[in-house]
Amino acid sequence: MTTQLEQAWELAKQRFAAVGIDVEEALRQLDRLPVSMHCWQGDDVAGFENPEGSLTGGIQATGNYPGKARNATELRADLEKALSLIPGPKRLNLHAIYLESDTPVARDQIKPEHFKNWVAWAKAHKLGLDFNPSCFSHPLSADGFTLAHADDNIRQFWIDHCKASRRVSAYFGEQLGTPSVMNIWIPDGMKDITVDRLAPRQRLLEALDEVISEKFDPAHHIDAVESKLFGIGAESYTVGSNEFYMGYAASRQTALCLDAGHFHPTEVISDKISAAMLYVPRLLLHVSRPVRWDSDHVVLLDDETQAIASEIVRHNLFDRVHIGLDFFDASINRIAAWVIGTRNMKKALLRALLEPTDQLRQLEASGDYTARLALLEEQKSLPWQAVWEMYCQRHDTPTGSQWLESVRAYEKEILSKRR
């Protein structure tokens, strides 16, 4: 530890103690908040089922930065590099298309054995795993419908895929000793004016009920459902709307997934957390950065990321909110994208933990909104960066932008050789 870092740390402890904050306790609390990193940033959502196939479902990964992972070995190596540069607890979020098999496997036939390498790797790196059925980039999703499909056979195929995915998810939780959160997102919707908006939603309701009919130990598996406003090619109607899934999660007591990019650009999920928590047992967050639409840009340490973190901490939702990331930028180094976004999420959580929330709540309750605003703004100037750097130091990860040198070296030695 450098003298400069030690001096900054001691000063930060004093400054935060002056406003009633124990920075050591804040760091202990930060270690209770894992962030689930998404595997699909590493290969632009290609997966291993058909890596040369096109990405469908109204989502896009734009850019052609060289060096993307082409197989599971490369993806795990890239993840290891990213994980080594991010302090504190992490998880990994997998999609079904990241299965490993010597022969083709239909999506309704996936089994735990197709993910045994991921489980062994997660054990070795002390990671929890989360999971997602992949209801896109497939011939039977080509017309834009899956679980809400009017064709009974196609709809049943996707039901069976989601049921098989739940068994994989439960296997993750059983093997790793931490519950896997399995999130269901489907692209189902229509491009133009839709006459019958009810029937697809009735089909989706019945399909989801069949999907979750098999009971699993909640210590191993947690169901989540995710809404969306629109997607490319489904601008006019989305079956799985916010109202649909809010009602479903509340009535079935599943987790509700809130994705930062899945609402109108003037809406923010930070404002939805406290409302949803009154009705659903758990929330899954997909922290992202929408630029004009659900563009899935890399997460910044911006106002909304901070507001999301503050909601979790202020209301002590540590055990009810699962923090995941969802972005995929193919225009920059993909390992750097993981590191930037995940470190930013953790920085936001730390800043929230360093807030004198009790004092601010008292000011608010007494009607002293002047002092509330003044202290909230002054809080931004306190030396949280020194606390962050100490956290990085204790977890043997680089402080500041030193991690970028490691990424550049890896790019030169490993990524540049991929063609």
Curated annotation (Swiss-Prot):
Domain of life: Bacteria
Subcellular location: Cytoplasm
Principal subcellular localisation of the protein: cytoplasm
Pfam families per record: RhaA (PF06134)
SUPFAM superfamilies xref list: Xylose isomerase-like
rRNA-binding among keywords: no
GO molecular function, one term: L-rhamnose isomerase activity
Signal peptide: none
Reaction equation(s) it catalyzes: L-rhamnopyranose = L-rhamnulose
CC per GO annotation: cytoplasm
Names of required cofactors: Mn(2+)
Protein task: Catalyzes the interconversion of L-rhamnose and L-rhamnulose.
PANTHER family: L-RHAMNOSE ISOMERASE
Family statement drawn from the similarity comment of this UniProt entry: Belongs to the rhamnose isomerase family.
Name of the molecule in the record: L-rhamnose isomerase
Organism of provenance: Salmonella arizonae (strain ATCC BAA-731 / CDC346-86 / RSK2980)
Lineage, highest ranks first: Bacteria, Pseudomonadati, Pseudomonadota, Gammaproteobacteria, Enterobacterales
